[in-house]
């Protein structure tokens, strides 16, 4: 059953038969921007109980979490769910705090971890990190935009410890060099 709600110029579609895990897997593994927007609306719908929601309803909930994590929401801007807006502003520190928070919430962490691309195995990391210590030891989401390249997630060190990390490269002229740098950082941390 599919229902839709229209608020202002934002429209979100809810498929009540699609699990959050299925949407999250598609969103994270393949960097599916449409599912990112849909999940943002689903967050708003779940938090408000409203049938008609806009992306703003989900953004309000994210801003509440930013405050709970000890950050000032005024320092950040979220304009969409997929990260393609020029008006988004997040920091690596905030992303790491989100990841640490998710780790502390068993059910959330299990869903998130399962959905993240795995270095050298699948999703947007399928062709990265092969033949290195990062192979199969990095579960992370890639992100790219004009002159920006990012990688954030979890990596498993040699001693078995999980580490939350976020790397953002700005003013990038070569996305390939930025990705190589990120992969090398992961290798170095894993090797410690």
Where are these regions (language model features)?
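Small-residue-rich helix-loop
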Residues: 30, 37-192
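Single conserved hydrophobic/aromatic residue that forms the stacking wall/gate
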Residues: 1-8, 12-13
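Conserved catalytic neighborhood of penicillin-recognizing serine enzymes
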Residues: 10-40
């Amino acid at each position: 059953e599919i229902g839709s709600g229209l608020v202002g110029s934002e429209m979100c579609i809810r498929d009540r038969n699609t699990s959050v895990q299925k949407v999250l897997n598609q969103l994270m593994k393949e960097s599916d921007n449409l599912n990112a927007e849909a999940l943002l609306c689903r967050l708003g719908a779940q938090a408000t109980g409203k049938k008609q929601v806009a992306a703003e309803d989900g953004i309000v909930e994210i801003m509440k979490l930013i405050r709970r994590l000890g950050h000032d929401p005024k320092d950040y801007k979220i304009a969409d769910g997929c990260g393609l807006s020029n008006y988004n502003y997040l920091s690596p520190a905030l992303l790491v705090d989100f990841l640490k928070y998710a780790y502390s919430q068993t059910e959330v962490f299990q869903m998130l971890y399962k959905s993240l691309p795995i270095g050298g195995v699948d999703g947007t990391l399928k062709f990265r990190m092969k033949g290195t210590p990062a192979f199969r030891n990095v579960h992370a989401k890639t992100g790219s935009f004009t002159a920006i390249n990012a990688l954030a997630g979890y990596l498993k060190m040699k001693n078995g410890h999980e580490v939350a990390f976020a790397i953002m490269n700005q003013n990038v002229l070569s996305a390939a060099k930025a990705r190589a740098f990120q992969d090398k950082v992961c290798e170095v941390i894993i090797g410690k």
